[in-house]
């Protein structure tokens, strides 16, 4: 008690002494022109004492002693530290922060001031990327910029990167929709760059900014700049985190006794005897006999079989002298999936070196390498996790897992536990090396020539091993096998660039010209063997050659390019830019090999006009205004090599006399006149800054049209060969990009809010000489990939409701609880009382989103910082494209709880039920025909990221030699709002070989230190 009293007296006396020595300091904060600045933060250095200037710019703050220092900060102005001395009145004038005006962004073959851009370019800095604890660099771009759709396709650690689409899907050909990615000017994969090595990412969205990349820029361009060395003593950094993943959404299946009751009900509806007795159902519920009457959750067992632990470590050093600067980094990443034996490992190294050889010559060298090792368990077909996930979706809880006798289930050919516990696996290993060297020659003040050479080399190896194992005493995989593939690819880039920059009074000119040559090559081999001695030997030469096969391939293509840029600026307010690239690709016939891709753009910085200065006197909150317009053309040559050549097959044999002789047959008739896909982009936009650019807003409207899409048209089978590609299609994307940013400081609290929104309308405008290609989801006037099917009007309430209704297309479904198909038209153009495929199918599904959006809130108070991001998509409706693995009881499949609880039943014959009547179909399907009944709104809003960090005070860490130590916790994909099917993630495109490996919800604890 005495100790507490003594401590109280000490604290009281200390505070009394401090208060006795304090005094008030008042003053006014203005800019250099004398204009008052409200909301300025004034803090007493080394304390938490602070004040904020009022609307008249005035402030009052209490200080103690004559050695006090005020720290004055205001967004858009240079921060100041002002000594108080013995003053009680202290006016402060802040200077505009020119760094904001001088902010540069990376563009094609150089940089430009952001305020002088005439095209549509979005950028994100390393500081923004570091706020995301992501596994792949592509995922860090989600929600950062408008105009780019970033969608993660699944949670498999071996393939959990994101697909990137800039301003809509521009083609439906094999040329693809992926943007061109350049890392330090050389083509590379974005996900093979460690996120910690990235300095900035720029997205070139319109033709004005991307035309200088010509025939590879139709889908947009992503420019990645890696970190460089710095002048000064070495700065060491270490970043690390440990994380735990779990599934975002998993469909819940019904219990075994509920499944038994459903089966009994559907049997009764069909007039058949029950499959399960009441005693059987009681045993399912009690769990007394888990072998014969189990309640085994196959999905839960599968997605909980892995530990889901991920770790990441990055170390780096940056430093250098005035002459030479260097950067070196090492990184390691490991992720264990939520499924056992499923993991990914990445090792990476990077060295960046910049040196000045003399006052005219500079040399830059960038080298990087990475090693990726991915593995996953495999099903009986050797295709990886697809069969295993499918089996878990399909098998009811009434089917046991591994039984005491070592076997699985009851005569089930798809048994995930058997596959998971077998020695089967799928492994993929990749090694990549990048070298990028350049020499910069400053010939004289305004003229620079750069020579650059870049080389990339990669090796990929895959092994798919299927073990010998038994599922039941009478069924299993009796023959083990191994399929192994090996491939290598390389690319060599040589380019020379000349730049001339000249300012004559109010006129600024910039000229760039260059020549580039690229060579791409690859080769691969593959082999298959089976009948290995046991499940422990899986080297290809240990298998039998009796059924063995071998494959081999090689390819090569080249691209020759000439490009240029012209910039003109008058008084930094009238801006003009022209770009052009002339490409020649070996992928096209000689007569159509070359293509010219030009662009023109202009901008008017209205804020630099004298009348704008006068306008600001009445509206001082108006700080910047610019309007922009551009037009240009881009190309797409990312098709297979030499598609203008006929393809031959050497397999056929022909009779000559009494013997068969080997021969050749044409299998593909090529079009000798094919050429580039050409994309024309028109863009108008404006940029607005308010309140000294604390609030900024920009918007763009664009029309992006792709013509001459390479497309294989349908022909009669009488031809006897597959037709080659022809330039026969067109697609249009129209849309808006919106960006809003606000930043402010209130007292000691700094915060920022950013919002992005992209609206887009995609449609096919031409399809050879037809209006639709149903099999490919192509319809003139509708988005790429549109679903074509029947319309419906709920369900039949009873069998009696079928009477008098138009004849249904599927007779066995025309009953109570069946989907009620609509009669829309007939031969005369009016409903004819019969629903059929010819007249009554229309567009029912839109797989492409019409909007993408994100809202980010970040800030800091004292040593704490935070970042929250909401992200989502809208305007898309879709179904779950997994057939029997989604539709209840079809082909003996499982039943989801959502369907169980919301289905039509005889006891509750709701014609508006979410699911139709359940029927047991041992082979085939009942209600899974393509109809709008199954299409749901796939829009969603997701808490994509949340991160909270704390930076330890320097006085605590200074003795350790560290200059900074930050601790943080972070989460990804934390929760989702959606009206899509329960348990199914709307961000994913399920179906095909991707199956359903749910996205990962990631919880992370990390540390970042610098010394």
Tell where the protein language model's regions lie, with residue ranges.
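Acidic, glycine-rich flexible loop segments
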Residues: 274-297, 310-314, 382-418
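Conserved small-residue
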Residues: 237-291, 726, 745-847, 887-890, ...
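Glycine-rich, aromatic-lined ligand/substrate-binding cores of catalytic
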Residues: 847-880
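Short Gly/aromatic-enriched secondary-structure transition segments
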Residues: 252-254, 466-468, 527-530, 770, ...
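Extracytoplasmic gating/loop element in the C-terminal half of outer-membrane beta-barrel translocons
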Residues: 290, 299, 474, 585, ...
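Extracellular/periplasmic, surface-exposed regions of secreted and cell-surface proteins
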Residues: 129, 177-178, 346, 352-361, ...
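Switch/connector loops and helix/strand junctions flanking conserved nucleotide-binding motifs
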Residues: 114-115, 212-214, 232-233, 247-249, ...
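Short, small/polar-rich motifs associated with maturation and membrane association
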Residues: 1-350, 355-358, 362-370, 432-435, ...
């Amino acid at each position: 008690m005495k100790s507490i009293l003594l401590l109280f007296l000490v604290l009281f006396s200390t505070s009394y002494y401090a208060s006795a020595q304090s005094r008030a300091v008042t003053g006014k904060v203005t800019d250099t022109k004398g204009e008052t600045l409200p909301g300025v933060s004034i803090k007493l250095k080394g304390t938490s004492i602070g004040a904020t200037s009022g609307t008249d710019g005035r402030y009052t703050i209490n200080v103690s002693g004559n050695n006090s220092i005020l720290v004055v900060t205001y967004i858009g102005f240079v921060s100041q530290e002002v000594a108080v001395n013995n003053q009680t009145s202290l006016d402060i004038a802040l200077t505009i922060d020119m760094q904001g005006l001088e902010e540069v962004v990376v563009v094609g073959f150089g940089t430009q001031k952001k305020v002088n851009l005439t095209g549509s370019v979005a950028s994100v800095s390393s500081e923004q990327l570091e706020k995301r604890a992501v596994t792949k660099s592509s995922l860090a771009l989600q929600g950062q910029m408008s105009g780019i759709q970033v969608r993660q396709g699944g949670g498999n650690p071996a393939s959990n990167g994101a697909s990137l689409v800039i301003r809509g899907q521009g083609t439906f050909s094999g040329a693809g929709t992926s943007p061109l990615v350049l890392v330090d000017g050389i083509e590379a994969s974005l996900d093979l760059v460690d996120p910690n090595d990235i300095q900035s990412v720029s997205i070139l969205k319109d033709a004005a900014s991307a035309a200088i990349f010509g025939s590879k820029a139709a889908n947009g361009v992503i420019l990645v700049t890696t970190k460089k060395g710095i002048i000064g003593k070495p700065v060491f950094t270490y970043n690390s985190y440990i994380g735990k993943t779990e599934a975002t959404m998993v469909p819940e299946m019904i219990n075994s006794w509920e499944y038994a009751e459903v089966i009994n009900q559907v049997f009764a509806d069909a007039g058949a005897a029950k499959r399960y007795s009441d005693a059987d159902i009681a045993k399912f519920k009690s769990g007394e006999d888990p072998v014969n009457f189990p309640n085994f959750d196959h999905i839960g067992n599968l997605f909980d079989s892995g530990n889901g632990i991920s770790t990441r470590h990055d170390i780096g050093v940056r430093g250098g002298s005035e002459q030479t600067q260097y950067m070196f980094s090492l990184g390691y990443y490991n992720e264990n999936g939520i499924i056992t034996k499923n993991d990914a490992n990445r090792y990476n190294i990077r060295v960046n070196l910049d040196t000045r050889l003399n006052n005219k010559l500079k040399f830059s060298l960038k080298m990087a390498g990475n090693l990726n090792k991915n593995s996953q368990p495999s099903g009986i077909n050797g295709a990886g996790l697809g069969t295993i996930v499918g089996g878990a979706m399909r098998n009811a809880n009434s089917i046991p897992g591994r039984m005491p006798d070592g076997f699985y289930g009851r005569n089930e050919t798809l048994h995930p536990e058997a596959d998971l516990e077998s020695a089967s696996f799928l492994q993929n290993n990749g090694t990549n090396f990048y070298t990028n060297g350049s020499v910069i020659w400053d010939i004289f003040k305004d003229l620079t020539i750069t020579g650059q050479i870049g080389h990339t080399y990669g090796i990929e190896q895959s092994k798919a091993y299927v073990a010998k194992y038994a599922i039941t005493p009478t069924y299993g995989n009796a023959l083990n096998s191994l399929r192994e593939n090996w491939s290598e690819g390389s690319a060599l880039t040589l380019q020379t660039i000349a730049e001339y920059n000249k300012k004559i009074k109010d006129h600024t000119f910039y000229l760039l010209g260059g020549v580039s040559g690229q060579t791409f090559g690859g080769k691969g081999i593959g082999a298959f063997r089976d009948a290995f001695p046991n499940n422990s030997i899986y080297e290809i030469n240990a298998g039998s050659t009796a059924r063995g096969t071998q494959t081999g391939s090689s390819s090569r293509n080249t691209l020759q390019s000439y490009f240029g840029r012209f910039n003109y600026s008058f008084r930094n307010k009238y801006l003009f830019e022209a770009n052009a690239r002339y490409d020649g690709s070996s992928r096209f016939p000689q007569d159509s090999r070359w293509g010219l891709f030009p662009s023109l753009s202009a901008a008017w910085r209205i804020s630099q006009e004298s009348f704008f200065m006068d306008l600001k006197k009445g509206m001082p909150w108006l700080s910047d205004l610019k309007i922009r317009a551009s037009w240009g053309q881009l190309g797409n040559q990312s098709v297979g090599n030499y598609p203008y050549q006929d393809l031959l097959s050497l397999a056929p044999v022909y009779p000559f006399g009494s013997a068969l002789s080997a021969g050749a047959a044409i299998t593909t008739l090529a079009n000798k006149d094919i050429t580039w896909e050409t994309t024309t982009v028109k863009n108008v936009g404006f940029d607005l800054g308010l309140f000294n650019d604390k609030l900024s807003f920009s918007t763009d409207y664009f029309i992006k049209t792709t013509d001459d899409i390479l497309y294989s048209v349908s022909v009669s089978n009488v031809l006897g060969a597959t037709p080659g590609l022809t330039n026969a299609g067109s697609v249009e994307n129209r849309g808006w990009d919106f960006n809003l940013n606000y930043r402010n400081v209130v007292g000691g609290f700094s915060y920022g809010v950013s919002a992005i929104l992209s609206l887009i309308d995609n449609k096919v405008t031409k399809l050879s000489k037809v209006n639709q290609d149903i099999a490919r989801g192509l319809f003139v006037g509708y988005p790429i990939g549109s679903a074509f099917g029947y319309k419906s009007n709920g369900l039949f309430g009873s069998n009696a409701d079928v009477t008098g209704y138009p004849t249904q297309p599927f007779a066995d479904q025309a009953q109570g609880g069946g989907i009620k198909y609509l009669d829309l038209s007939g031969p005369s153009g009016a409903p004819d009382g019969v629903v059929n495929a010819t007249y009554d199918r229309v567009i029912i599904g839109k797989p492409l989103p019409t909007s993408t959006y994100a809202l980010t809130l970040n800030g800091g108070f004292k040593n704490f910082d935070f970042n929250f991001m909401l992200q989502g998509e809208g305007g898309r409706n879709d179904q779950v494209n997994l057939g029997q693995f989604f539709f209840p009881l079809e082909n003996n499949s499982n039943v989801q709880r959502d369907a169980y609880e919301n289905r039509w039943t005889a006891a509750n014959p709701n014609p508006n039920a979410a699911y139709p009547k359940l029927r047991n179909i041992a082979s085939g399907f009942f209600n899974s025909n393509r109809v709008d009944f199954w299409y749901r709104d796939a829009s969603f809003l997701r808490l994509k990221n949340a991160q909270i960090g704390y930076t330890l005070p320097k006085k605590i860490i200074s003795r350790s030699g560290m200059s900074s130590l930050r601790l943080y916790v972070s989460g990804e994909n934390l929760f989702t709002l959606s009206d899509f099917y329960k348990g199914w993630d709307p961000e994913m495109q399920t179906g095909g070989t991707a199956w359903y490996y749910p996205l990962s919800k990631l919880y992370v604890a990390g540390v970042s230190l610098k010394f």
